[in-house]
Amino acid sequence: MYKGFDRSVSLYRQACKVIPGGVNSPVRAFKAVGLNPVFVKKGEGARIYDFDDNEYIDYVCSWGPLILGHRHPRVVGALERCLNEVGTSFGAPTELENILAEMIVEAVPSIEMVRLVNSGTEAAMSALRLARGYTGRNKIVKFEGCYHGHADFLLIKAGSGALTFGVPTSPGIPAAAAAGTIVARYNDLAGLEEIFKLEGEDIAAVIVEPVAGNMGVVPPAPGFLEGLRNLTARYGSLLIFDEVITGFRLAYGGAQELYGVAPDLTCLGKVIGGGLPVGAYGGRREIMEQVAPSGPVYQAGTLSGNPLAVSAGIATLEVLKQPGVYGRLEQTAAALEDALKQAARQTGAEVCFNRAGSMLCAFFTGEEVKDYASACTSDTARYAAFFRSMLEQGVYLAPSQFEAAFVSLAHGKEEIERTAEAARHAFKAAVEQK
């Protein structure tokens, strides 16, 4: 039974005195849904609990990393062993780093060598520096609505016209940082071909989320990823898949296994740390050997490959490698999608559902969502009403229309049934939202 948010409100006020906006990442503030943030006390399996003793079925899963659920015994055991027998950090190589790197190389055919870092932002930033160093070119292409971390030259929105050189999206980003970034429309291969006709000889790389997961969930159109592969190869540019979200989530080999397209470089994060801070970038040996100390492209990190994150990552991948795991995730996610669709139909809610494997999104729009522009037709006020109703009924979703919901191995029939029942009331609340 819903018990209110008094303790969370008190903690938020306390946080606002010492933390900008009261949170350490903006979306956590719940501004888009008109609430104060829920302060989480603990997690277990598919559930989280707040400081007012409310219980929630969790579909945020720490924004994707917790594919096994909260406090999975294998991960907890690995962390305990690491703390008791190894340590937290050395700033020196460990055998654990070798093990995780070998597991990644074995899992992802396009990766022959991999470098561990501390976050998805570091992975994308480093991969793009490497692409520029390897090709000797300066410009990059990203896609509208795709997020690759908060490095200056990646926090860019589209300009106007066919060739859309970027415009900074945040104060503090110099115009010069955006000058080398070209923004294209996701799923628009013809538009990208026009960009390459004009600038192709200067483009070092195209970076893309193979399934966009930061404007909701937007899968690639048939032939889009294949077209990117062919176009970049034709012009001698590198293709970079940002699989920070999709890596080891959509398949053991990531989105590139699912869609059968091999990039030159891949960015990883989230799942490979089992809930601890981590990132990685990897690719063909001839490219990766340009990274220092093997080559001249510099990248470093004090806590890169730290034993705790690596131990949690190894334990997570060991579970994911077991037979039938991704079939179970697919079955659960499909059941959730079907249940939500049925609830929406019963209430007359106008919703577009997109799903790729165990990540999905309910867009409050009557349009097919295939890119950033169509995602932006969503009625965010209706989503906020839906979110608030679900939260009060014990279902924790992303506090933004433009984020994914994630299914973990801890979710099962009971969670789906409870979510479906809550959704029937929540979609009704959304329909009644003025």
Curated annotation (Swiss-Prot):
The gene is hemL. One of its GO terms (molecular function) is glutamate-1-semialdehyde 2,1-aminomutase activity. The keyword Transmembrane does not apply. Its EC number is 5.4.3.8. GO terms for biological process: protoporphyrinogen IX biosynthetic process. Coiled coil: none annotated. It comes from Pelotomaculum thermopropionicum (strain DSM 13744 / JCM 10971 / SI). Homodimer. Disulfide bonds: none annotated. The lineage of its organism: Bacteria, Bacillati, Bacillota, Clostridia, Eubacteriales. Pathway: Porphyrin-containing compound metabolism; protoporphyrin-IX biosynthesis; 5-aminolevulinate from L-glutamyl-tRNA(Glu): step 2/2. One of its GO terms (cellular component) is cytoplasm. InterPro entries: 4pyrrol_synth_GluAld_NH2Trfase, Aminotrans_3, Aminotrans_3_PPA_site, PyrdxlP-dep_Trfase, PyrdxlP-dep_Trfase_major, PyrdxlP-dep_Trfase_small. It catalyses: (S)-4-amino-5-oxopentanoate = 5-aminolevulinate. The modification N6-(pyridoxal phosphate)lysine is found at K270. Its cofactor is pyridoxal 5'-phosphate. Its main location: cytoplasm. It is found in: Cytoplasm. This is Glutamate-1-semialdehyde 2,1-aminomutase.
